[in-house]
Amino acid sequence: MMMFSSLPRRAGVCALAASAMLVSGAALAQAVPTTFGTVIGNGLLCRDQTANFYYYDYLLKAFGPAYKHDGGAFWFKTEGANLWGTPVSEVMVSDDTSTYIFVGAAAEATPEELEKAIIAQVGLHYARIDTSAFPVREAKPASRIVYFDTKSKIYCAKYKPLPPVQPPAVRQRLK
């Protein structure tokens, strides 16, 4: 087995630099985690506790920093990700300025196609909750599918829990 110390100094430095470039290139082109469907998919279907810090940390580790912070949410590009057989291009997680805690995703399919994919994979059915030209679809656990230009957006939003109210101080009479 050949060691770096047995190579000429210049060759050792070049080999070290080349291996560093391979490692940094691999870090940039991260694969979608195998847990993506379980973690993000169940979160979008409101089948799990909705905690924005948990989803933010998960997406940060899996896809790197959010590419934008807009509309009370951090937006992450999720190249190569699929949920229910449908490509998902972005996932958004609420920040602490929103009155809701939410996780959402932009799917590369119409709401009708996304709904059919979820029914086929999970068996969860959605009901149209309005009669507009672009109806909102809602499932029992509160997951919603809405139009997002030519694509669809699916999200789970819950009210942010308020801190417990402290009872007023009890006045005591001094003796």
PLM ranges: what are they?
Residues 18, 50-51, 158-161:
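Extracellular/secretory pathway and lumenal proteins
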Residues 24-26:
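N-terminal signal peptide c-region/cleavage motif recognized by signal peptidases
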Residues 77-136:
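Long, charged/polar, surface-exposed segments that mediate recognition or autoinhibition
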